[in-house]
């Protein structure tokens, strides 16, 4: 019995360590909201590509479940990357993109810039901890679908989403003021399967996070 206890403790410690290891530009990664199936994040140093695996019921209502590769960031920034699901088949509501959130609490204040499995492009947010995300007043849809490049920019309390195709100009999806988002927050890449029984995969590359020089 004691042997089994130490084996389980060893497995738990290894999993916890894996969840906090740096991945490329990001200091941490892990599952938010305790999804049924564990996700992962890896970085290929040769191709500068991130590989994300994630499950989770959704990023919606008053709590979230997803895999998150993230770092702490303070002040203004511009984050840009190219996103692609691995595998053509999957839930039309599976999600990848950029996210900024107050904390790793599953009910945290957050804003995400999303590309869905069916190509739907949207900016959505939770303004207060534990608040239900609202449709349609808590999101901005773009009329066109299927873009690869997603950009999230913060200027003061304003967050701006832009999208585009590789090599093309960026188009603005919308902007939203987040007065309750702290100056120091968590920024990163995410994936959610929109199905607790499934683990989805995505690759992300050409990842850049730029911040203005300190005055």
Regions found by a protein language model. Give the residues of each.
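Extracellular glycan-recognition regions
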Residues: 19-215
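Bacterial Sec-dependent N-terminal signal peptides
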Residues: 1-20
